[in-house]
Swiss-Prot record:
It is an enzyme of class 2 (transferase). Signal peptide: none annotated. The gene is trmFO. PANTHER family: GLUCOSE INHIBITED DIVISION PROTEIN A, METHYLENETETRAHYDROFOLATE--TRNA-(URACIL-5-)-METHYLTRANSFERASE TRMFO. Its main location: cytoplasm. Belongs to the MnmG family. TrmFO subfamily. It comes from the Bacteria. One of its GO terms (cellular component) is cytosol. Disulfide bonds: none annotated. One of its GO terms (biological process) is tRNA wobble uridine modification. This is Methylenetetrahydrofolate--tRNA-(uracil-5-)-methyltransferase TrmFO. InterPro entries: FAD/NAD-bd_sf, MnmG-rel, MnmG-rel_CS, MnmG_N, TrmFO. Keywords: Cytoplasm, FAD, Flavoprotein, Methyltransferase, NAD, NADP, Transferase, tRNA processing.
Amino acid sequence: MTQIELSCSAVHIIGAGLAGSEAAWQVANHGVRVVLHEMRPHRMTAAHQTGGLAELVCSNSFRSDDAANNAVGLLHAEMRRLGSLIMRCADANQVPAGGALAVDRDGFSSAVTKALDDHPLIEINRTEVDGLPPADWRNVIVATGPLTSAPLAAAIRALTDESALAFFDAIAPIVHRDSIDMSKAWFQSRYDKVGPGGTGADYINCPMTEAQYHAFVDALIEGEKVDFKDWEIDTPYFDGCLPIEIMAERGRETLRHGPMKPVGLTNPHDPTVKPYAIVQLRQDNRLGTLYNIVGFQTKLKHGAQTRVFRTIPGLETAEFARLGGLHRNTFLNSPKLLDTQLRLRAEPRLRFAGQMTGCEGYVESAAIGLIAGLYAASDARARSLAAPPPTTALGALLGHITGGHIESIDAGPRSFQPMNINFGLFPPLANPPAKKPDGTRLRGNEKTIAKKQAISARALADLDRWIADALRVAAAA
């Protein structure tokens, strides 16, 4: 915390969900006044039930709290080191949930609301911001979440372009590259086409025989589906967003004439046999550690997804960084629209945070709110703040949102989609662990665990250095 600087202009934060609440806390704790705008309870969304700040509208779980072996647990640890209000209130309202951090949702929201309401530098304004903020608001964080009100969403869309906001996002599963069996799969672009930034071998291809294809179609149709939430039912599908199981229901050959078409590709493992269908995976991050399954947006339940998708040749032992989904959402094409400090390129006084930026999950939304708050506080005090290292969970998530994602290899709609934190977003280790303390070689699951633990240890060490070298220097300047 720094000396209070009442001469600073207030930071206006629109939306008091997890991201907005965390951002407000960070800004105020760095000595800068905050006006936190929240339209509830005077204007409710289709999902919220109360006027409480940081209301959890779906699950009450913050997922794994294991900082050594799980990426979201590591993110928990990093946020705690930075004095996160969301993590403090989650810890104080924890309920039993095994290795996960789950909370009493009402107690959690009440604790966040009280902390912000009691802070001398935070003013909570219970009115709707129904358009672009006034021009004299020079330092603004927009953290209105996936259910942004229509007037504000329209204003943001007009400021950017019609395609900048998606209101029904299609999420395809993402697989860790090193879990794909390349003795069955191969790299090749359709017709060996070299697109922008491509090489002609930009996709991983998984072949299917006729029998495998028909068994796969049956499994898709029979798989257990997630029901739409009440506020999603009337939302139409957009072009290119049909769930794969809906396509399968329209005809047994639909998929092999759509995302699974086998044309323009030759299997080098068996070049004389033409596959009946082919599943393609496309690189999903610049590091090349994550690949998404092209066209596989789905409403299958997660258990059904892992069971069905692991029947694909080459994906029998696939590890998923994210499973698929299709739900109503509002998010920006952040790599195109935001700079590295989450500011809108078209109007830099506006900074975005939370799920609107393309992160997925409670913890990730709060984490981006935390970073946005630190940046806004630095701007208000005319200070410069370096980004957290990309080797940290915070830096890896920020890097993915603002530029770590590949927009597109070939022609077609943008591919940026919401993402949970996962180890695939981190830069590879320079010297990954290969041996146990006794000198024997690490293999299988032991090797995977050792790698995750090394990434986590590196992250916390680098975060501590960043706090000492960048954050404290910026705060004290």
